[in-house]
Amino acid sequence: MLIHVLGTAQDGGYPQIGCNEACCNLAWENPEFKKYPSSLAVVDESKKKYWIFDITPEVKSQLHLLSAFECSLSGIFITHAHIGHYMGLINLGLEVMNLEEIPVYIMPRMKDFIMGNTLLNQLVENNNINLIPLEADQEVYINNLLSVEAYNVPHRNELSETVGYKIIGKGKTAIYLPDIDSWKNFENKLRSLIDTNDILYIDGTFYDKTEISSRDVSKIPHPEIKETIKMLSDLSPADRKKIHFIHFNHTNDAIRYKSKIHERILDNGFSISRENQQFIIS
């Protein structure tokens, strides 16, 4: 069983709609540099199944990345109600895939959000999806090789709560934490997660908030990568390597391979998520 990275960008992907600045022109002019919104898959080849963590607007292309496994979609875990993390659900209904009873694992407010949204609730009424309630800090057993545990994360919770996920295989464990407002009041939890897990995919939205000039960054809070690196500078080299930044904004040079920022992060001993990376957990 393995984790397969399906996307590494912020909700809008890379390049981002409406952006004609230098940061995005590279990808407009060279489609090979395109990046999908953040998402992971857990693939169980022995049972011919996979589960995805967040279902993005680019899910069509992301699931195609898994076609070589010849496995079927068997469940979806959603972190929160921001568009890059749930909007792919609309592809499961009558107009596109018309799937049947796909388990969608969600927290209580996220369930209320789906049930209260006419478009999404139609998926429930038509039995395309089956909403499976989660509780924070309660392990859910998917099969004899895989279990998952949700934990609450401080983030902009306008429409739902936000969670991260612990993915537990037979041999190794991983953390998926693409969105958080700040490490304030969460640093001890983060350090505990680093101590007790093998790989962590954590919020790398901005390297430095000065990269945003056209928006009020106070309204889109995320920790800066440079501050995360500083905060975790006391980690051992082995623990630093566990940290894989993910969820990069289009303005963040970490998303651009071999950029100075990309290399600076690696030089500090941390890792950068890449699409199609794999990590064995069982």
Language-model region placement:
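Core dinuclear metal-dependent hydrolase active-site scaffold
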Residues: 1-66, 133-193, 278-282
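Residues at the starts of beta-strands that form the adenosine-phosphate
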Residues: 2, 101-103, 130, 147, ...
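Residue-level marker for beta-strand->alpha-helix junctions and adjacent short loops that shape enzyme
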Residues: 10, 83, 111, 207, ...
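Active-site metal-binding motif and surrounding structural segment of the metallo-beta-lactamase
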Residues: 48-52, 56-105
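Structured loop/turn residues at beta-strand edges in well-structured enzyme cores
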Residues: 71, 84, 100, 127, ...
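Short internal beta-strands
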Residues: 77, 102-111, 201, 244-246
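A short, active-site helix/loop in glycosyltransferases that binds the activated sugar's phosphate group
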Residues: 109-119
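Cap/insert and terminal regions of metallo-dependent hydrolase folds
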Residues: 171-173, 180-277
